[in-house]
């Protein structure tokens, strides 16, 4: 043995293609959300953009659950663009009114998504937070650092932030299941020492959160740190896990949250997906046209279990 493998056991509740899923949190929530979407799950991926600290994540969930509007005090103008301290930088408009309109639409959409979701996947990135006028912000939007104070959350603060939103979640969706993971992305900007402290706080907090019956923990952080445990599984920046690592973590996630029929369905779709990605030298040839027709038959058979309408319509255009 030259490594220590982390084994995952099937969760009490399992994800199916009939379930609606919402992911929120750090950029690893995007990674997991995109993997789910690629495999034909119904998923809304980080509707508020990437948010790294748990207080801001749970605040956004609270606002979505209660359909509470964002405060205008959080709006800031920087370099001619209006943004909100609770949201990712991608939400920016030329006027305050345009931003308010966009935020209102975002709130309404996410409130409905949360109400319909069977699963909420939350990825916590860091316990390091920035405060402005006593309020923790999700994003500083390149505003002068002099306007913020920086500190590290305590375990109690993280747990309290979830407790504050928990009742609201159940009021809007009594059957929701929550998967929490600590992001394996390293926050080296705050130094590796602080990153280690930050991840430890998040990990202890999540361990206590799993006392709530709706919360389960998926060990993506441990898989990266203690199972893969090698720089060849990182991107060139030595901060983000690479595609090989994502594949491996996804495999572990599948073992924990998908049953065997769901995994087999994913394998069938992946085979068809590779067929669709095939680029022939001679698209009009009899051989390729036969290949397309066979692929179409297989897709139509699978369409009773997965939503393949878009792919079927695109494939029809290629068949002569």
Language model region names:
Residues 252-320:
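Conserved catalytic region of serine esterases and O-acyltransferases that act on ester linkages
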Residues 177-179, 200-230, 252, 266-267:
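Extracellular serine-dependent O-acyl
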Residues 132-155:
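A solvent-exposed, charged loop/short amphipathic helix patch at secondary-structure junctions
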Residues 1-74, 205-208:
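Serine-esterase "nucleophile elbow" of acetyl-processing enzymes
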Residues 125-127, 167-196, 221, 227, ...:
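Active-site segments of SGNH/GDSL-like serine hydrolases
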Residues 113, 158-178, 205-216, 256:
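A structural motif corresponding to the C-terminal end of an alpha-helix
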């Amino acid at each position: 043995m030259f490594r220590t493998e982390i084994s995952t056991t099937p969760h009490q509740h399992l994800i199916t293609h009939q379930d609606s899923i919402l992911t929120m949190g750090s950029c690893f929530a995007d990674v997991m959300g995109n993997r789910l979407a690629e495999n034909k799950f119904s998923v809304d991926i980080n509707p508020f953009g990437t948010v790294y600290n748990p207080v801001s994540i749970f605040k956004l969930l609270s606002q979505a659950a209660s359909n509470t509007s964002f405060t205008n005090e959080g709006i800031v103008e920087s370099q001619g663009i209006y943004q909100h301290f609770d949201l990712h930088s991608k939400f920016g408009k030329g006027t305050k009114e345009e931003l308010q309109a966009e935020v209102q639409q975002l709130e309404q959409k996410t409130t409905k998504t949360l109400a319909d979701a069977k699963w909420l996947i939350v990825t916590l990135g860091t316990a390091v937070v920035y405060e402005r006028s006593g309020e923790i912000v999700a994003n500083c939007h390149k505003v002068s650092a002099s306007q913020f104070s920086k500190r590290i959350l305590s375990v109690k603060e993280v747990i309290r932030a979830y407790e504050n939103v928990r009742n609201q979640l159940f009021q809007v969706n009594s059957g929701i299941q929550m998967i929490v993971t600590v992001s394996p992305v390293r926050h080296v900007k705050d130094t590796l020492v602080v990153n280690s402290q930050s991840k430890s706080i998040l990990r202890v907090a999540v361990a206590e959160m799993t006392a709530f019956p709706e919360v389960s923990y998926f060990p993506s952080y441990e898989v990266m740190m203690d199972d893969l445990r090698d720089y060849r599984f990182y991107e060139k920046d030595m901060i983000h896990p690479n595609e090989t690592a994502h594949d491996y973590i996804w495999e572990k996630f599948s073992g924990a949250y998908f049953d065997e029929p769901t995994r087999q369905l994913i394998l069938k779709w992946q085979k068809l997906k590779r067929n669709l990605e095939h680029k022939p030298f001679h698209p009009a040839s009899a051989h390729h046209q036969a290949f397309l027709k066979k692929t179409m038959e297989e897709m139509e058979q699978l369409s009773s279990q997965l939503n393949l309408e878009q792919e079927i319509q695109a494939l029809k255009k290629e068949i002569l």
